[in-house]
Amino acid sequence: MTINFDTATQTLEAEGLRCPEPVMMVRKTIRKMEDGETLLIKADDPSTTRDIPSFCRFMDHELIAEDTDSLPYRYLIRKGLSK
């Protein structure tokens, strides 16, 4: 199954930022989104390969897809239901 990263509701450009900035920006952006909307994150910090999946698990968001084979890394997240 091919994931189309271009269908994201919003995009967050986090290239050039280093830990913990990318995840902080993801959190801030997702807080403003509606449940079910999708966020494409583009980043080049190697720590995002660990931090973004962990953030999704911890905050109950769905990591739909990730592409970490080349830079920039891309992550597609669906915002979980607000509690």
From Swiss-Prot:
Cytoplasm as a keyword?
yes
Superkingdom of this protein's organism: Bacteria
The gene name on file is: tusA
List the transmembrane segments: none
Q: Name one GO biological process term.
A: tRNA wobble position uridine thiolation
Function text: Sulfur carrier protein which probably makes part of a sulfur-relay system.
A GO molecular function term, named singly, is: sulfur carrier activity
Main location, first listed in the record: cytoplasm
Localization, per the record, is:
Cytoplasm
Q: Which keywords annotate this record? A: Cytoplasm
Q: Which catalytic residues are annotated?
A: 19
Q: What is this protein called?
A: Sulfur carrier protein TusA
Q: Which Pfam families match?
A: TusA
Any single Gene Ontology cellular-component annotation: cytoplasm
> InterPro entries from the xrefs?
Sulphur_carrier_TusA, TusA-like, TusA-like_sf
Q: Which family does it belong to?
A: Belongs to the sulfur carrier protein TusA family.
Q: Which organism is it from?
A: Aliivibrio fischeri (strain ATCC 700601 / ES114)
